[in-house]
Amino acid sequence: MDINTLLNTPDEDVLSLFTPQVARWFKEKYKVFTPPQKGAIPLIKKGKNVLVSSPTGSGKTLAAFLGILDTLIDLGYKNELNKQIYAIYISPLRALNNDMRRNLIEPLTELRNLYPDLPEISIGVRTSDTSSYEKQKMLKKPPHILITTPESFGISLVSPKFREKLSDVKWVIVDEIHELANSKRGAYLAGLLELYKSFIAKNNFVRIGLSATISPLEEVAKFLVGGNGDYEIIDARFVKPTDIQVVSPVKDLVHATEEEVNIGIYSYLVDEIKKHKTTLIFTNTRHAAERVAYKLRKMFEDQNIFDSDLVAAHHSSLSRDVRLEVEEKLKRGELKVVVSSTSLELGIDIGYIDLVTLLSSPKSVSRLLQRVGRAGHHIREVSKGRVVVVDRDDLVECTVLAKLAIDRKIDNIHVPENPLDVLTQLIVAASLITPIEKDKLYEIIKNVYNFRSLSYDEYNNVAEYLAGNYGLDSNKVYAKIRIKDGMISPKRGTRMIFFLNSGTIPDEAMIPVKMENGGYVGNLEEEFVEILAPGDIFVLAGKTYEFIRSEGNSVIVKKSEGQRPTVPSWFSEMLPLAFDSAIEIGKFRGKIAEAIMNEVPKDEVISSIMSEYNLSRFAALSIYNYVKEELLFTGGIVPTDKLLLIEVYDDDDQNRNFIFHGLYGRRTVDALSRAIAYIISKDLNMDVRIAITDNGFAITVPGKQEYEISKVFDKLEPDKMYEILSDVILRTEMIKRRFRHCAERSFMLLKRYKGRETSIDRRQINSEVLLGVVRQIEHFPVLKETVREILEDYMDIKRAIEIVEKIRNGDIKVATIGPNQVPSPFAHNILVKQYTDVVLAEDKRELLKELHNKVIEFLRNKGIDIDLEYTEAGIK
């Protein structure tokens, strides 16, 4: 149902569906329905499956629950309200569950104040935080509405006594479905809902999905209902007015020092904070969130602006108690500014925010809209967002993302396909609900959207593994099910294993870093360790170290004083640029380049950028200069969505760098770069280095090796890429960590067993032993899944193959320049990413400035007279 239909639906049509009591309460409290409510309530009342997509503050929750509450109240007045669970609300966040309980109790309390004889509607929360006593109480007196998480829902289904209480549920609500659909956690929940429908539910229940702005809605709806389920979509994604602007903190992004940029950023932030009641600032890393909060507190104190206690940080590394305290203070209006990484993107109720500021690119349109949507917590209030950029690439990227957001063009989500570790848990869960025919269970699993293309061989391999038919008993991997006469049933002890080990979220480990001689240095996050390769140099506690190897759950390093870091310490936290957005950035570059090449007057181009993209003159001028410099440097070539530029650059360290300017998003670039590096490494018979960014990648070869780089795509056959990359990643740190995660999800490694918890250190050591064993087993499902997860979920091999096919058939042209002793302007950030760390931000800006000066000198040496103004004042 589109937005115009929703807006034109008379309120009286919806009110007429309610009992007089609920109709009166609604009219007195809210007066009018929001578009999502106008669309969803009548459909839910009719028993239709519904996906509601709309921004924060548009009344989604009430749209889902009001019809349900009204039906329960009506049943109560008719003395037909039984002691049973009628509705299940499933949310990915426990904090959302507590919010939801409060949000449901409030209207019921207000209704009871109006009508003292209102039937009692009970609400219960069942998560890992719920005490055994509370769970026992639920068995005796189940709540009418059950609030839970995917993991606790799974445990409920295999609990013999409690699942009886779930047999007559009428509605299942999945909140924040956009957060679930693109993860294994979502695949797990989708599978659990299918098992619930097939084995426990007496009747067809209504599925209601609540989502922030997401695309494509059809795919998310299919994920919600599974199989051949019918559904209706309420598309109210763009119902709230949105005001998004990109801001440059300095007039000249090229020549400003790091100090000038920082002064510009914080001056801007303080000015905006003063003008608004509550400001929410998003950074892209937890480290940056802490840094910005600290700096603002200090400025508030030193300049006597506000009390420094009015500033708080909120991110996932903080304790739950600290996060809850910040959320409560926000709701009560006791904070002036909160700085967050990603933790406040989801729909936790955080009260009134009138400005959202993003420091640097959010990397996708949907994330931009989600973050900005936190401002103006009512449907008629403007969601006001400002994006502060730090360099020219950031400016170009954010300019395009902001325009796409205003034009309502959203990136498509990625839904994991056939995650075999999740399948393992679903087969075990099914066996614990009831003994089942193996072939019948396959048909049920195929109804789950994530498993629609699952082959019988893949399914059978997982079942055989669970039945202990791979001979892993000597490695203490025992059967969890038995298969006899085509029937699957659980082995003794399997129920307890499921209770203690089910779920898909891996334990996050801090990895100890040790010197070769055994001295302790500090800790690194596991995500960071998995991207390291021998020889990588990184910063820890302000000093540089070279990665040698990992041993079990430790990292072995040696000092590398004076050497530049090759991997930024925040790299693993960085959000990847979405593929669809990357393609649009390529188109934007091409559009500006074409105008310049066609000799459209400079002022006309700049005015056009200003008006079409809502930019200041400084920002538009900066983009114009950036593209023009690249054109002058390359002799008229700018990398776009239709042209891949390969630049050969010989650096001062006698290395040859092959720089691939390909805007395809980080996940695609990651896969593409490793495949190309494999070809070059094989041809030259030497190790090469890779540096990956959102705007392309650099492959560095020691010594100025001659290599015909333009022919590399002739050697890279698309149908061999999966095989090549599988082979490549089997030699990385990543495979060790990811295999442990998949082995834990597959019950190969047990986190908890017989009342004992196994440490992550011990599990990592055990997993590496198991990895060595299963590498010898053909088509072993847990290893196959580890490779699939890395290539399809972490990277995007499908898009990488698509790009190679387009290059080989001529849809994407390839141009080559060099070798040069100076890198082109567009190459600077790709190269600088190799050499910079957060502690060296000043060095990064100096290096960029130095590279820019070399470009100007390079052009003048070629007889090209550069005359570009860099600020409105006309600095030449």
Swiss-Prot record:
Region WH domain: start-end pairs: 422-506
Disruption phenotype: No visible growth phenotype, signficantly reduced survival after UV treatment. No change in sensitivity to methanesulfonate or hydroxyurea. Slightly further reduced survival in a double deletion with upsE (an ATPase implicated in mating).
Reactions the enzyme catalyzes: Couples ATP hydrolysis with the unwinding of duplex DNA by translocating in the 3'-5' direction; ATP + H2O = ADP + phosphate + H(+)
Keywords, comma-separated and alphabetical: ATP-binding, DNA damage, DNA repair, DNA-binding, Helicase, Hydrolase, Isomerase, Nucleotide-binding
Enzyme Commission code(s) on record: 5.6.2.4
Function, as annotated: Probably part of a 4-gene DNA damage response locus in which the upstream ups system, in combination with this downstream locus, functions in homologous recombination to rescue Sulfolobales from DNA-damaging threats. DNA helicase that translocates in a 3'-5' direction on single-stranded (ss)DNA. Binds Holliday junction (HJ) DNA, Y-shaped DNA, DNA with a 3'-overhang and single-stranded (ss)DNA with high affinity; binds double-stranded (ds)DNA with less affinity. Has helicase activity on DNA with a 3'-overhang, Y-shaped DNA and HJ DNA. Does not unwind blunt-ended dsDNA or DNA with a 5'-overhang.
Protein name, as recorded: ATP-dependent helicase Lhr-Core
